[in-house]
């Protein structure tokens, strides 16, 4: 039996852009040929694609690092370097992707073939042909390729099911799924026979169909991690209707109504929104002695919790083993699904603003200035660091261009205001230089 894995932590790194080239045209009969260095190729992006054939995140158990290839360097004759191919990572339907550092949801992948760029490849550096001007017709300037984005991610699989079966262990959830669908869950006369979610397609006599999930049994304290805990509670979140299965024969010695209250408390504690989903109470094992008396007592206790303004949940008496009452239950479930919309899984505040992430923020902070214990001034900031890594420090003209960019950003003036003096050391990353006032 293959293992069921529904969470994973991975890292992804997009490819770096290829470096631009410094080259000059040198051909017979072409005097003053000018610059001829081409741009570097784009780095490969990391793209997640949904594959309906996958059922778990098992592929990520041992393969946790995904790195796309870098673009090729620019070439002479103004030719661009070859762009790297994107790295396609296949994930199962129902995979939620979060930023591990912020906890924000990046994307929710539910449709077969759906694709999302998770880490964007760096752009290629410009070759010297791009920097030619009337004042400098033969520039010895080329950019390094831009680094690709790097992210730490948390993947979470929540199976796609219209209906979820919940209840204590051994109340008959797996048996119910096995008789109303072609699913073959493991069934046994002991607790936690079901240790992974099972999914089956149900078709009613009237022709309606829906996906039903049998989830591992819950016990008191599950929302705090007791038993199988929250490990599988997450799979209920995508369901639109909950079938709350109760052993009305009380064969385990528990009170059916207390079971009902206890499970609902766990659902509410785990995620308050789960209680927004309509529930149908499935009174199972009604072919057993005392089940009828227990059902009467159950209904009496349940009625005390509702008033004239709140409708009692629907209750269906069934016996999965004897195949009794199943048709009415399934028809009612299909009718309830037809008038129940999808539920929002996340608040907007939980979602990453991808436009802002990919550089369309209204105000990007250009740089910050701090001072180390050794009195070195330290420059940081996304824009400044991006300019720095794309500067070819082996060429004087590139360094001079970077110095002009710093002045244009106001770095020199800001250093003076902070008290920097001629000859002070300034550091960007691992690169150090002297401040010249």
Swiss-Prot record:
Requisite cofactors: Mg(2+)
Role played: An essential GTPase which binds GTP, GDP and possibly (p)ppGpp with moderate affinity, with high nucleotide exchange rates and a fairly low GTP hydrolysis rate. Plays a role in control of the cell cycle, stress response, ribosome biogenesis and in those bacteria that undergo differentiation, in morphogenesis control.
One GO BP annotation of this record: ribosome biogenesis
Molecular-function GO terms, alphabetical: GTP binding; GTPase activity; magnesium ion binding
HAMAP family, sorted: GTPase_Obg
Protein name: GTPase Obg
UniProt-listed Enzyme Commission number(s): 3.6.5.-
Pfam families reported for this sequence: DUF1967, GTP1_OBG, MMR_HSR1
OCT domain sequence ranges: 359-437
Record gene name: obg
Residues annotated for Mg(2+) binding in this entry: 174, 194
UniProt keyword annotation of Iron-sulfur present: no
Keyword rRNA-binding carried by entry: no
